[in-house]
C-alpha cells in the first residue's frame, strides 16, 4: 500500500488528507523500509508539500505523541523550525521566559540543535534546567510556574522510525516543519519562525487546521526563523480562523536596524551567557531582537493590544528582573521535581 503513495508523489501528484494520514501512520508504526521512506521524503520535497499533506502528517504525529493534559487550554509555544543555518542564539527560548513572567502559560516544545551549535534543549540544559521530565512533572510545571519544556525526543517516540533516513538524506524534509506543529500539549497560541518564506502562509493555514486560535508565522529578514532586526519580516497572522499577510520592520516599532551578525550565537555555553546577560540588563541588538519577538508573542497571546505596547511590556519584564526570576524558578522547580521522582 505504501508503494502506491510513493508512486503518486514520485509522479508529482498530491496526496489527499486521508492518503497522507495513512502513509504517515505506516511510517510512525515502522511499517515502511528505510529505502521506501527516503524515496517518499525526497519526492515530497521535490514536488513541494501541500497544506493537506502537512496537516495530515501533524495530526498523526500528535496522535502518536505522549499527551500532556492541563485544564487551561490557553497554552502557548514559541518553537520554530530551525534549519535556517544562520547560527543565531536561542532567541525563542529567551522569549519563552519573558512570556511566562508576563503571565502567558508557555509549553516550550524543542529539541537538540538543528542549524546552530545549540538547540533549545542544549541551552536550557546549560542553564541548569532539567529537560527530561515525565509528563506528570511537565504538567506540574505548566500549572505551578507557567512554563515547561517538552523535549521532543521524549514525547515523540514514534519518530524514531524516520530518524535514520532523515540523517542519511541530510536535506530538509517534511519533518523539519512538523516539530513546531506537533506540540503534545493543547496549544492555542503560537509564535513560529520558519526557514522558508514560501511556507509562511501555508503553515498559518496548517495551524488553523490544527485548532490554533492565534498565531504569527514569521520568516525573518536575511532568512532567519525569528523576527529579525535587519529589515522586513514576512508574517502570516492567524486570528480566529482568518489569516492576514503582514510585513513588519524593526523601524516601524521604534527599534534600531542591525545586521544578522549582531545576533550570532555559539555553543550552548555561549548562548547561556547571552541570555543571562540580556536578563541582567545588557542593552544592544541581542536584547532588542528578544524584545521584538516577545512583543509578537505577547500580542498573539492577547496580553497587549499592539506590537508597540508589547515592546514596552517586554522591556518592563526584563528591567524589573522578572525574566531572570522566572528562569531561576524553572531551574529550581525542574530539579526539585527530578529529585522528587528519584526518591519516591
Swiss-Prot record:
Pathway membership: Amino-acid biosynthesis; L-tryptophan biosynthesis; L-tryptophan from chorismate: step 2/5
Residues reported to bind Mg(2+) 1: 92, 226
Reaction(s) catalysed by this chain's protein: N-(5-phospho-beta-D-ribosyl)anthranilate + diphosphate = 5-phospho-alpha-D-ribose 1-diphosphate + anthranilate
Residues at which 5-phospho-alpha-D-ribose 1-diphosphate binds: 80, 83-84, 88, 90-93, 108-116, 120
Gene Ontology CC annotations of this record: cytosol
GO biological process: L-tryptophan biosynthetic process
UniProt cross-references to InterPro entries, sorted A to Z: Anthranilate_Pribosyl_Tfrase, Glycosyl_Trfase_fam3, Glycosyl_Trfase_fam3_N_dom, Glycosyl_Trfase_fam3_N_dom_sf, Nuc_phospho_transferase
A family per Pfam: Glycos_trans_3N
UniProt KW Amino-acid biosynthesis keyword: yes
Binding site for Mg(2+) 2: 225-226
Keywords: Amino-acid biosynthesis, Aromatic amino acid biosynthesis, Glycosyltransferase, Magnesium, Metal-binding, Transferase, Tryptophan biosynthesis
Residues annotated for anthranilate 2 binding in this entry: 166
Family: Belongs to the anthranilate phosphoribosyltransferase family.
Subunit structure, interactors included: Homodimer.
Record HAMAP family: TrpD
Protein name in UniProt: Anthranilate phosphoribosyltransferase
